[in-house]
Amino acid sequence: MITRLSHLFLRTLRDDPADAEVPSHKLLVRAGYVRRIAPGVYSWLPLGLRVLREVERVVREEMNGIGAQEISLPALLPREPYEASNRWTEYGDGLFRLKDRKGGDYLLGPTHEELFALTVKGEYNSYKDFPVTLYQVQTKYRDEERPRAGILRGREFVMKDSYSFDLTDEGLTASYRAHRDAYERIFSRLGVKYVIVSATSGAMGGSASEEFLAESEIGEDTYVRCLESGYAANVEAVKTLAPEAVPFDGLPAAKVHDTPDTPTIATLVDWANGADLGWTVTAADTLKNILVKTRQPGGKWELLGIGVPGDREVDDKRLGASLEPAEFELLTEADFAANPFLVKGYIGPKALQANGVRYLVDPRIVDGTSWITGADEPGKHVVGLVAGRDFTPDGTIEAAEVRDGDPSPDGAGALVAARGIEIGHVFQLGRKYTDVFSVDVLGENGKPVRPTMGSYGVGVSRLVAVIAEQHHDEKGLRWPAEVSPADVHVVIANKDETAREGAEGLAAELDKAGLEVILDDRKASPGVKFKDSELLGVPLVVVVGRGWGEGKVEVRDRFTGESREVAAESALSEIVKAVRG
């Protein structure tokens, strides 16, 4: 097919959009691939839609290749299935909720575990029907609080979600592995650099969970890996290596000290090092106690104390992942006023436990470790408070930040931190949703069997932005051949009618050879055409210009920047060879 730029619905921009923060957003808008309609909501224009459809094609080919079958479920969904699974509440403000004219509650689907489970229940009732894997490529909706980076994090997005149904845990493992392998093929074909990391399941539920993260400095997900062992995990999933417990023998008794004007860790350390305690105190010797309030879905707010070494900050993402499905908030001044035993800047574990406040600590706070922490009175701290002897936590929590150089959970070396963009996620859900909806089938022995599920997502529209993020330069986009909106971009760079006829003829021959061709036949200057060819990012640019009269055309590689002249009579074969390898 030949796409003529003189007819194409396209307007390129020379300047970056004012609201664009990241390269992919800037370039996709400037190149006329997408246009913003509202925060987190974008229109796909002709060239952008082509790239999106190419990504969808690759995803479909690999899903079909593992025996998955495509269906399409509605995006407008009734409340009842999500009420049954408790996700009507668990999703909180992230759901788009609406009512019909009769007052019935509906939502715009963020994901479809419930509906797939009910669909299988309605159609299959025998072990002979299993295993089965179904998938869809569909628009999803999530009410993101802060949509950003164009189509990287939007409120409306295209996602491939698939669901496997097996009768045994071994079957689920096989389905999980098949999807994992298919995802590796998808991302490799798309030219995406990625890592696979251990992850948490969040509101999805289930056990085994891995994320596919595209390597990117602008990614919202922080992950760590151990270069020695290959261990990799999202920071929310990192397990802290706990030290061995320390014997209590010989540990001095805890002692309360006057510590005026020491409400922060820094001021406390300064005081300690001027108090002649007998050793040099660092922030790691202090115990920082953070108070939050938590609420289970449909429940009431409750206080929660969190103890971490003073040299660590609490990571909100890790804390949120540890508390799911509960939500949490920091305490307000009104909360402190209602709980006078909470002395800001001087909170210790004893008052928390004396007042029935649940107290969870970092795994590094083991029995026998001695701490400097709040004494629950203004201007007072206690030195030598020993875990397991002077206070007993209610458990541990993974809430402290993970840092470069921390020991890997597998003990093989140090962790190195990096950032990425989530492009895929695989879960072994187990029977969470088949239990909710009592999905039972007749087993081979005549008894009921409950299928076990897997859930597998790929961010299809997000992948367009990810590819743009990883494949661009200062001039514009550089699409991998697998997803490019065309195979060849032919530029008519001369007003000479002979050159124009030559370009038209070459484009027609390329079309007959089965290539997708963009032909820039506009009445614009060569400079404008060259800039647009670089901005649009088709991997091969063919220039028909002044050299045509000498029987030559120019072939430019958008990825390498290399340019070469080829004879006009051999241009067709040279271009086809370059495109098809």
Curated annotation (Swiss-Prot):
In alphabetical order, the GO MF annotations are: aminoacyl-tRNA deacylase activity; ATP binding; proline-tRNA ligase activity
Q: Give a GO cellular-component term.
A: cytosol
Sorted alphabetically, the keyword list is:
Aminoacyl-tRNA synthetase, ATP-binding, Cytoplasm, Ligase, Nucleotide-binding, Protein biosynthesis
Coiled-coil residues are: none
Top-level taxonomic group: Bacteria
Q: Which Gene3D superfamilies match?
A: Anticodon-binding domain, Bira Bifunctional Protein, Domain 2, YbaK/aminoacyl-tRNA synthetase-associated domain
InterPro entries, alphabetized: aa-tRNA-synt_IIb, aa-tRNA-synth_II, aa-tRNA-synth_II/BPL/LPL, Anticodon-bd, Anticodon-bd_dom_sf, Pro-tRNA-ligase_IIa, Pro-tRNA-synth_IIa_bac-type, Pro-tRNA-Synthase_IIa_type1
Function, in words? Catalyzes the attachment of proline to tRNA(Pro) in a two-step reaction: proline is first activated by ATP to form Pro-AMP and then transferred to the acceptor end of tRNA(Pro). As ProRS can inadvertently accommodate and process non-cognate amino acids such as alanine and cysteine, to avoid such errors it has two additional distinct editing activities against alanine. One activity is designated as 'pretransfer' editing and involves the tRNA(Pro)-independent hydrolysis of activated Ala-AMP.
| Family of this protein | Belongs to the class-II aminoacyl-tRNA synthetase family. ProS type 1 subfamily.
Q: Which PANTHER family match?
A: MITOCHONDRIAL RIBOSOME PROTEIN L39/PROLYL-TRNA LIGASE FAMILY MEMBER, PROLINE--TRNA LIGASE
Name the HAMAP family for this protein: Pro_tRNA_synth_type1
Assembly with partners or alone: Homodimer.
Q: What is this protein called?
A: Proline--tRNA ligase 1
**Species per Swiss-Prot/TrEMBL record:** Rhodococcus jostii (strain RHA1)
